[in-house]
């Protein structure tokens, strides 16, 4: 990487493909500061995949959001033959999957809610009075919005009103990052444990930029909430879920966010060993994509985590389209290789699994006690590179684990089910996704289960409008009735 010039408002960075890269690129990145945010433009020189002649193209990243990156990579696909982003491909929903999602909320209830109702967690809070109906509360993801974690309430699960935020502006946890394009406030869940309300949530450590799980507490489900001074778990962990037993003992579920780790490990390995691109990728478009990302990597690796994901996404998609086969190919390639190569590939494979764990919470809800137990990990083809967004509910003598799999920002995302005889498992997965994208709603994800006023169980989830999936895009609140059977879950009738 060569820095050609550097001024307070503008810098040029020149990047060349490493030797032995099968599709050599030269990329010049221009960073310009405008309106307190950097804007990027690129001069890309490479081989035209149709004429096989060298050409140079100019690109301006028109927006530093998911749409802007999709536009950028769509143009690269047309000019240089990179893989077309999944969200720009012709979508074919599974014709065998039939479901009707009930639209609960399809717009923000308050202007301060910026991104809708991603990762919706619903609970019922019973009144101390025998004459008053219980109230349902729902919390959702807020990403980098000024106010974190909207709280809404309802008495019937149909009509909702805005209450406020777990963390209003300037009241976020001291340990967590709080900047646009940097902070990530995800997946809050509120649970009542005895006489107190606990909100478990994801935030990004302001020093390490790692995702962590924190907790905030209040005696009122509508707040105010006070966060603990330190997170409960650190080190790229997300999606806390709490299960409270009848005796008040609480357990915390969480997921290791290794899907944020392995892409960088793999790209770095290919940067140092570019000849393996030809061994690992079959389709030419994927070889070109890998070569492009390897060239860009010395610059991309220094970006903030979610922006790094937006750059890496098409590379990730080239792998998760046949994820289990790619994993097996890595295993085959590392055989009989020098020890450093074997160790580097094994490290990539280690992070290609995203295990979920459960562990008992302390009585004050601020720490873990005992030993953790692994619940599930991604091992089905449809799940691809991750499982996440879990919720466990008990019905009779069975425990039902609902979870999401695949890429949250594409039509490939879906919801799975695993069933156990004990809270700690072992859990047996239903082989096919329980919920998938439809023509009306994309990427159903991060479910929660609640009993409706009529006593019947309903699954609440989020979904994108078709063609509008992506990071920090609006997610609607949807629901479906469900029926529990001993070895499976079925959709009920709306």
Spans of model-derived segments:
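Carbohydrate-active catalytic/glycan-binding domains of CAZyme proteins
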Residues: 2, 6, 10-14, 18-37, ...
């Amino acid at each position: 990487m060569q820095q050609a010039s550097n001024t307070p408002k503008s810098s040029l960075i020149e990047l060349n493909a490493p030797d032995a890269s099968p599709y050599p690129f030269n990329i010049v990145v221009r960073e310009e500061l405008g309106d307190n945010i950097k804007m990027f433009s690129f001069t890309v020189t490479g081989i035209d995949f149709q004429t096989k002649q060298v050409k140079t193209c100019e690109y301006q990243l028109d927006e530093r959001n998911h749409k802007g990156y999709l536009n950028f990579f769509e143009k690269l696909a047309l000019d240089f033959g990179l893989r077309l982003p999944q969200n720009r491909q012709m979508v074919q929903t599974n014709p065998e999957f039939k479901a009707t999602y009930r639209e609960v909320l399809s717009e923000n209830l308050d202007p301060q809610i910026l991104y809708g109702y991603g990762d919706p967690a619903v609970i019922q809070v019973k009144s101390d009075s025998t004459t008053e109906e219980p109230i349902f509360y729902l919390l959702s993801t807020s990403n980098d919005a000024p106010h974190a974690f909207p709280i809404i309430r309802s008495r019937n699960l149909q009509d909702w009103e805005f209450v406020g935020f777990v963390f209003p502006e300037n009241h976020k946890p001291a340990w967590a990052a709080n900047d646009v394009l940097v902070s990530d406030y995800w997946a809050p869940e509120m649970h009542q444990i005895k006489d107190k309300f606990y909100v478990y949530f994801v935030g990004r450590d302001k020093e390490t930029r790692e995702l962590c799980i924190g907790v905030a507490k209040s005696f009122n489900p509508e707040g105010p909430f006070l966060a603990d001074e330190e997170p409960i778990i650190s080190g790229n962990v997300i999606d806390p879920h709490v299960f409270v037993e009848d005796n008040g003992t609480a357990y915390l579920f969480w997921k290791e966010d290794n899907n944020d780790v392995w892409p960088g490990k793999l790209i770095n390995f290919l940067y140092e060993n570019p000849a393996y691109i030809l061994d690992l990728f079959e389709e030419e478009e994927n070889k070109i994509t890998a070569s492009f990302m390897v060239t860009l990597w010395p610059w991309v690796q220094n970006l903030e985590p979610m922006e790094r994901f937006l750059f890496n996404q098409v590379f990730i998609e080239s792998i998760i389209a046949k994820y289990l086969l790619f994993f097996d190919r890595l295993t085959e390639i590392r055989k009989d290789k020098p020890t450093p190569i074997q160790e580097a590939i094994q490290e990539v494979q280690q992070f290609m699994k995203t295990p979920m764990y459960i562990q008992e919470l302390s009585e004050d809800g601020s720490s873990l006690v005992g030993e953790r137990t692994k619940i599930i990990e991604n091992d089905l083809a449809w799940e691809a590179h991750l499982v996440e967004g879990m919720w466990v509910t008990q019905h009779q003598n069975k425990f039902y684990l609902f979870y999401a799999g695949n890429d949250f920002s594409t039509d490939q995302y879906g919801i799975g089910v695993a069933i156990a005889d004990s809270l700690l498992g072992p859990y047996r997965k239903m082989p096919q996704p329980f919920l998938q994208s439809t023509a009306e709603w994309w990427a159903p994800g991060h479910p929660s289960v609640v009993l409706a006023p009529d006593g019947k169980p309903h699954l609440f989830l989020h979904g994108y409008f078709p063609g509008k999936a992506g990071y920090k895009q609006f997610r609607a609140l949807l629901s479906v009735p469900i029926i529990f059977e001993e070895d499976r879950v079925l959709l009920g009738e709306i």
